[in-house]
């Protein structure tokens, strides 16, 4: 990768500056594409409302939906949302990458004290989208992120009474991998070994809610050990837009494309590949 080339220390000054310029351009393109994607998803959700499918957040719930979410937390979500206090972790990159995390700010009401914690959104257990009770003739769907936000008083129950703010972020570790040239293993096995080894890589890309306060951003970035030319992308509230492929149809199957079966190249199955 370009980051690795820069870190090698073997470049002449002219080459070094050229690569830095390319990386800055890539980061700018990332920001532009993110904005375009956000505009497109907003339009899609607006059009879904024409079909009586509505996306709600934690501030738009009626009493029935609030009670339903409380039961959902105690019946299912509780136990999958254990917080990690930010003061107890120096290196966030030891956590699993490509997952959605909420960094939670807890302001104690009875005294001037602020604490911070990280909560992983357990989307691989429950899915990214949850159908909640309908209202006003609409089928209602929530991001699991927002359900976790709603449940913060339950997650931190037993502690001091607090005001809560939560901001999402995710990080990606260095995806470059070295594949050993060992004829005793198939290509697929060697790739699998390479993928496993790259889990120990350093974070090279961080996406975060652009409404996250600057001082909190600094706390997160410092604990991720991000560098000058790593990709830092402030976006809207939600990340991992690929999860939209699993958005529930709410009974409107005509709104979804048919699924295509995956293809496997025979060459990848060969021991001689």
What are these regions (language model features)?
Residues 1-273:
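N-terminal localization/anchoring segments of enzymes in phospholipid and broader phosphate metabolism
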């Amino acid at each position: 990768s370009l980051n690795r080339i820069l870190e090698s220390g073997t470049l002449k000054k002219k080459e070094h500056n050229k690569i830095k310029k390319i990386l800055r351009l890539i980061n700018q393109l990332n920001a532009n594409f993110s904005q375009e994607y956000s505009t497109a998803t907003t339009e899609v959700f607006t059009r879904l409302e024409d079909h009586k499918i509505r996306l709600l957040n934690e501030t738009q719930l009626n009493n029935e939906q609030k009670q339903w979410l409380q039961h959902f937390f105690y019946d299912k979500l509780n136990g999958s949302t254990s917080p990690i206090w930010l003061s107890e972790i120096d290196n966030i990159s030891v956590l699993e990458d490509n997952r959605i995390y909420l960094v939670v700010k807890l302001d104690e009401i009875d005294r001037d004290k602020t604490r911070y914690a990280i909560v992983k959104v357990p989307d691989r257990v429950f899915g990214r989208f949850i159908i909640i009770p309908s209202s006003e003739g609409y089928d209602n769907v929530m991001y699991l992120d927002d359900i976790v936000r709603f449940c913060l008083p339950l997650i931190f129950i037993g502690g001091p009474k607090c005001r809560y703010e939560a901001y999402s972020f995710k990080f990606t570790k260095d995806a470059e991998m070295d594949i050993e040239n060992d004829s005793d293993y198939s290509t697929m096995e060697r790739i699998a070994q390479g993928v496993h080894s790259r889990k120990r890589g350093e974070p090279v890309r961080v996406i975060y809610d652009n409404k996250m306060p600057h001082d909190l951003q600094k706390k997160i970035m410092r604990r991720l050990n991000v560098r000058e030319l790593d990709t830092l992308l402030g976006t809207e509230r939600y990340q991992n837009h690929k999860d939209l492929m699993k958005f529930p149809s709410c009974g409107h199957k005509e709104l979804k494309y048919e699924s295509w079966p995956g293809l496997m190249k025979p060459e990848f199955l060969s021991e001689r590949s």
